[in-house]
Amino acid sequence: MWAPEEDYKQPLLTNSRVANNGNNNNSNGRGGSSSPSTRLQPEHSSRKCNDILFTILFLLVIGGMAAISGIAYTKGDPSRLVPNAPNIPSIPGFNTNTTSSENPIEQYFVSHLESLVAELKRDKDILIYSVLLAIALGAAWIQLLKSFTRFFIYFTLCVGVALVATLGGLFMALGHKEGSESTMIVGGCIIICTLVLVVVIVYLRKSIDLTCAMFTETCRGVQRSPSVFVIASLVVLFFIGFIAYWTSSFIYLFSIPGSTVNPLNDHTSSEANSTDSEQEQSAFNTKIRNLMYFMIFGFFWASSFISAVFQHCVAGVVSNWYFSRDPTGKSLVGQENAYRSLGRALSTSFGSLAFGSLLIAFIEFMAFMLRVCKNSNATNKLVVMVVSCLQCILGCIESIVRWINKFGYIYVAMHGHSFCTSTKECFDLISRNMFNAVIMDFIGGLVLLLGKILGSAASALFTTALLYGMGKSLNPITIALSAIFAFCIFNLFTHIVGIGTDTIFVCYLEDLETNKDGNLYISPDLHELLQDKCNECKEKEQKNQSKV
């Protein structure tokens, strides 16, 4: 995808710097002493299968989902879910024999939807062109991000702020023209958000240089292994296939004859004088509900595991590239780097990834059960308030666990340790080097988000111009789908860059502890910026302690 880069030939650290810092190294610590011609790599344990218990549990859950799917496909009847089907039971108080022709509103929406779908079929070629354009823009975006990092990041920030300000101005003008106060209020809120965004960017201007260097280093590592994009695409396609399988299984399970009551609604109750058949029906519905809960939990675990495999692959690619460079900056890693990382994720690190994803799945399942409880007790305001508070707390816990898992997966990819060991050692590494505050200063997330928005807007504009130039009607569904596809494609690119940036950060800390600030693997510009940032954090800490 990319030609070999000339910027790899630059030396990572000058000999004078190595000579000055080489005397400060001693035999204490993990790396020992290092000479200008010798660079030590972090200690790697022999890779072996870890967290085997969670591997077995995950495979059992997948096997259980397959067994339930077999039962659902055998006994399910999705035609029962179609309105006005002859075998669907009638609901008291509703006339199920009413046709759509007797309802003019329904007839209007159905006919309008049919026309939109027909236009969408006619515009399928334009959708294909927009997807190809989004892929090309994503590849160009990464190349620009590496070659013109500072300019491109500032350009992205300025364009993003300008777009938000323009949107606010349009809402204000539209509200003034139509005399709508609500529209003007929305425009005012958007303009206020724009001002807040400008203040945040000005406050974090010192971190922009650090972000530029981090992104440059990440793009170098990613471009040395373009196969990571192939692996990422395969993971996404596998996830889409899994969603299709799970959705069809769930529909068939929901449509098993006898499950006339919504299994996800706990309102079901029986009369005191119910017959034996009604009791059997209630018991059958309980079984269906429990199977559905199992399928939902399995979906959360499997989807979290797929995401963990993706993060492991990217982290393995970037970390392997980081520690495989020679003193001139060249690396011997190639196309097989990503495939080896995927192989480790599906073999020795399988249990560790299953363990980390299980934590996320359990939290997501608890959040789902809280939503079911909230819907079942919608009339009880006290229960709704308590459940809403629990949902807020659980959401905060989920964000923290996801943040912890991210670094745990990176360390698993680097060393092959178990999940708990990797997470503990990674955060010990961060705390020992006083860099935990640096992560919060990065504005990379904002840049990546604006990049996704710009990519989606460019694809939508391209589709609109193409439809207009070909004399076709501007189908809103076609334009919206092109923007959605572009957002998903850019999300894939930016997700790779985001994980790679976090991996570079952890690799630098490991590099610094191993080589003791002498003859490091990292490029000199990023090393200087990180050292300056570390000194700033230490100065702030000393000032705070002196005030206390």
UniProtKB/Swiss-Prot annotation:
Name of a matching Pfam family: Choline_transpo
GO biological-process terms attached to the record: transmembrane transport
Sequence segments annotated as region (Disordered): 1-44
Glycosylation sites: N25, N97, N273, N377, N544
Keyword check for Transmembrane: yes
Membrane topology of this protein: Multi-pass membrane protein
Family per similarity comment: Belongs to the CTL (choline transporter-like) family.
Protein name: CTL-like protein DDB_G0288717
Organism of derivation: Dictyostelium discoideum
